[in-house]
């Protein structure tokens, strides 16, 4: 909720998102097929881990893609913000709003057609113009910067970590902290020539990496 064509809520929480993920899996019949594997990128990785943690049904595993689990000693003065901070406004036409589309955190992407595709599906007509679809209060309500993120270390199911080698979110400090705290044998797979938005930089390699991890778990 709060993103794309989904509705907006008065409040958001990791537990709420975890329940939403599990509800989708339940409604789609995934639990009837086997133990589902949940995969999420960035903030979605933390919500996927929450889903795996709170589920009362067996989960095949959780794969987190470029989700920075920061150590207690992390210096937030150097923190790269990834959430939208500007309030939504109305643009007069499609062209002007699409020109404003940016990845957050900002990065270059050679696959411009993918960025363009996402931008075109991120807008809606409103107030005699165009607006972004996302809930611009979501990060205020979620309290994301203060929430517990190391829940991934406490999962009963398997865990996988994928990250972009050029990601400014996955620093050496963060990668070392994750490596030292995940269960033995946890796959930590780097994707070369990929920044934080791994799916946009290396979509095919990411898909193959996810499938490779999943096949070893099934």
Segments the model singles out, each with a brief description of its role:
Residues 40, 44, 48:
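Gly/Ala-rich beta-loop-alpha elbow adjacent to hydrolase catalytic centers
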Residues 5-12, 73-76, 172-173:
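Conserved catalytic-core motifs of eukaryotic protein kinase domains, centered on the activation segment
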Residues 1-4, 69, 195:
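Alpha/beta-hydrolase active-site loop signature
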Residues 1-39, 208:
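Active-site loop/oxyanion-hole signature of alpha/beta-hydrolase fold enzymes
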Residues 191-203, 207:
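Catalytic histidine-centered segment of alpha/beta-hydrolase-like enzymes
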Residues 49-53, 60-94:
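Flexible "cap/lid" loop of the alpha/beta hydrolase fold
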